[in-house]
């Protein structure tokens, strides 16, 4: 079965874009897929838009960068504009729910898209620091090719040292992952032009 998934994630520095990309890449690799990730920072680096490219396949991946993504994630106002070049007709645009006006301004009503109120959920139910893990869970749920356990193992590898210092962080990250995963599963195979969670 042919499988090749191209994901671009973008947000402000500090929003955890690179961490989310590393975790999904690690989880994919552990699940037996070929996976490559490459970071791309704005010219300002600090204070610029951070973009991560992830490519996952059953076959060897020659380069993680691509011109059009299957899924493109935008987590900030500047990221909505920054990822425009990677959004094609069939691309699913996943974005922070508070960016609806920005998305409409840049993409109109034509783009397949999914608004996820990840920041609101993180602030109201958990902690703002797990905002990116909610988005990660949404990606895992939408795509359906990874098990939550694979992602939990990747989280352990990435954040295990922090979990050891504060065991509550593990539970918080696992809850955020599960919450995002549930949202993604509900929206799996999103085909409508606009979907709100």
Q: Where in this protein do the model-derived segments appear?
A:
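Active-site cofactor/cluster-binding pocket
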Residues: 1-197
């Amino acid at each position: 079965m042919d499988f090749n998934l191209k994901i671009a994630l973008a947000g402000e520095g500090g929003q955890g874009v690179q961490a989310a990309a590393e975790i999904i890449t690690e989880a994919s690799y552990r699940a037996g897929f070929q996976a490559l990730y490459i970071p791309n920072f704005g010219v300002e680096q600090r204070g610029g838009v951070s973009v991560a490219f992830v490519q996952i396949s059953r076959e060897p991946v020659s380069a993680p960068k691509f011109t059009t993504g299957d899924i493109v994630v935008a987590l900030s106002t500047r990221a909505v504009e920054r990822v425009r070049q990677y959004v094609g007709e069939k691309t699913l645009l996943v974005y922070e729910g508070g960016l609806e006006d920005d998305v409409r301004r840049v993409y109109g009503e034509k783009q397949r898209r999914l608004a996820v109120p990840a920041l609101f959920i993180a602030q109201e139910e958990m902690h703002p620091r797990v905002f990116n893990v909610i988005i990660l869970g949404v990606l895992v749920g939408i795509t359906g090719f990874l098990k939550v356990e694979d992602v939990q193992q990747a989280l352990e590898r990435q954040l295990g040292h922090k979990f050891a210092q504060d065991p509550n962080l593990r539970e918080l990250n696992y809850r955020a992952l599960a919450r995002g995963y549930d949202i993604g599963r509900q929206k799996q195979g999103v085909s409508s032009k606009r979907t709100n969670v």
